[in-house]
A protein has these predicted regions:
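Class I S-adenosyl-L-methionine-dependent methyltransferase catalytic core
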Residues: 1-138
Length: 138
């Protein structure tokens, strides 16, 4: 796709967010909506996070933490990371772990937005959080 209208360079990478190592302080924004461990299985390929990290603990430390860490390294000071991730009936602590990891790495939580998901006929709307974190100045 042609992104010249943005008048900025756009780089697109095809690899997992836990593998992408951005240049230090090169990003203005980091937005991610990672799969919720083994709840969203797109394929059984070895590139999938739930295949690479088969237990919840391995996934949190090997995938989620590394993804957040890469955002922190890449973000410029006072820039934002937004992460859409939610607890599931099977995994009830993903949200708390996300917040804990982000704060441990040095992010400040500034807000939590609500993402409105498609409604199911007669069931009303479902919401998921989008956590907003800022990388503080040193």
């Amino acid at each position: 796709k042609d992104f010249l209208y943005l008048e900025k360079q756009v780089d697109i990478y095809k690899l997992g967010s836990e593998e992408y190592e951005p240049k230090k302080e090169s990003l203005d924004l980091c937005f991610t909506s990672p799969p919720y461990f083994d709840t969203e299985k797109y394929s059984l390929e070895s590139t999938q996070s739930f295949v690479k990290f088969p237990t919840e603990n391995e996934w949190i430390n090997g995938f989620l933490k590394k993804t957040i860490e890469n955002c922190y390294i890449g973000l410029k000071e006072n820039r934002y990371m937004l992460i859409n991730i939610a607890d599931t009936p099977k995994h009830k602590f993903i949200e708390k772990e996300t917040i804990r990891i982000a704060k441990e790495l040095g992010f400040v939580q500034e807000d939590t937005l609500q993402l409105t998901l498609s409604s199911v006929m007669g069931a009303g709307y479902k919401y998921e959080p989008i956590f907003v974190f800022r990388k503080e100045s040193k």
